[in-house]
Amino acid sequence: MSGASSGTAIGAHLFGVSPECRVLIGDEGAGPSKSLSEVSFSVWYQSRAARLVIFCLVASFLVPCLTFLIAETVMGQTIATPLSLTLDHWSEVRARAHNQGVEVRKKKWVTLCEAEWVMMNVGWPREGTFSLDNISQVEKKIFAPGPYGHPDQVPYITTWRSLATDPPSWVRPFLPPPKPPTPLPQPLSPQPSAPLTSSLYPVLPKTDPPKPPVLPPDPSSPLIDLLTEEPPPYPGGHGPLPSGPRTPTASPIASRLRERRENPAEESQALPLREGPNNRPQYWPFSASDLYNWKSHNPPFSQDPVALTNLIESILVTHQPTWDDCQQLLQALLTGEERQRVLLEARKQVPGEDGRPTQLPNVIDETFPLTRPNWDFATPAGREHLRLYRQLLLAGLRGAARRPTNLAQVKQVV
């Protein structure tokens, strides 16, 4: 019997049969009997196919877990860009735009930054930038006169500039480094000059003979001879002039000529309200050239009210004019009848305490006055009055642009 048992053991070893299976088939030399569950586990453990199945099950569980952990780590280390910063702080961006009297939309904000401003070919990156040079290049395209401009994009580029010039705490680390100051050219070293030779008689420079004056030598004449080479000397202020008979008033032409000589023309600064020292706003009125260019390069209000309304909207947003500047702008770009219609439509939109248009005359006169108010733009209250006034003026322009149908013209066509 022992020989049979040893033969069975050798056969079981050669064919990969475990001792547990030998016990199940009745081999007495296989040792003590075990339970069915212990036998099944031992068979699964020693079988190569069973080990492979267990490995695949463990791997199918671990691989998704590791993939999820790696993805979370990579997403946590995503590089922030100016565009992503503004989207993460969108509530602050909208509040900044609202304080300037404009509204911005998140979807259009992304479209302009990633597509339209990039296609302007002015160096604007898809991820956005807080560089004032890039913002200025985009502004030139947006504020281009006539059909080449983009008035609908004015609120967005204005908000970008506001974030760059007055950055909040989350923008400051992403501002471009300031440009190094341009070094001043070093003065050239003086070249050694030849020794001076003395002469008994100095050599006088040749002078051209004086030109005869075009105008008669009348000292009391207010006109100035513009053909002479040198301007006449102007008396300095050495004290009060002696009392005596007053000289006749100079003509307007002579006055303008003298003012041009005495006060050279300065460069035009078409920014009525600008920040000065200590963040205090300074006043710069419109120049005549600005008003002339706006009027000559745009159609009249009666011909294309939408285009002129968009122009005035961009001026109101970027220049932030005072009450006087708004009247000057309306007088330059609109006729008398058009101004009356715009002011009437604007006064209809004055909000009351409940936010709806009111009909109380005192509230209307206080919010949208027809006479010059006492609003100080250097104070927050004055700037708030001006902001609401500009919004109502823009609403009046849009209301006046909806002209009623001329029934006489319709009858002629029929």
UniProtKB/Swiss-Prot annotation:
Residues 171-282 are annotated as: Disordered. This is Glyco-Gag protein. Residues 73-414 are extracellular. Glycosylated by host. Glycans are attached at residue 134. It is found in: Host cell membrane. It is a single-pass membrane protein. Residues 174-193, 210-220 have a biased composition (Pro residues). Residues 1-51 are cytoplasmic. The chain crosses the membrane at residues 52-72. Plays a role in viral particle release. Presumably acts by facilitating the fission of the virion bud at the cell surface.
